[in-house]
Amino acid sequence: FFPRKAAVEEAKLQEAMAMNELHHQQYALNKTIHNHRLKIQQLQNQLNYLRNNALKSAGILINTIQSQYEKENIEYYEYLEGMSTANDIKLKYLKVLNEYNQEIIRLNRYYSRSWD
């Protein structure tokens, strides 16, 4: 009788430990997903700014610089500096876009695992 009671108590303890581990893993997963969603939102905000402001400014800068250079109002080094600045803006957009896409892929991995 006594060994059986000990085995039951041991099983209950194991069950409680397993449930505790399950809750811990669920919390960690939810926190990870939440963090990915926050990062995606931050990146989306950056992309919106870059699309609506910085990329338009880069386009205007390119047009202005090309026009000024063709009219010989600026030197070649000024032309290069302006083009470099415009290209830096475009490169920044592409880097943020890449980071956004990578974050979406990371988040989707968590959702696709639940279907396996």
Label the model's feature ranges.
Residues 1-56, 73, 95, 101:
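Sec/SRP-type N-terminal targeting helices
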Residues 57-113:
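Short segments within alpha-helical structural elements
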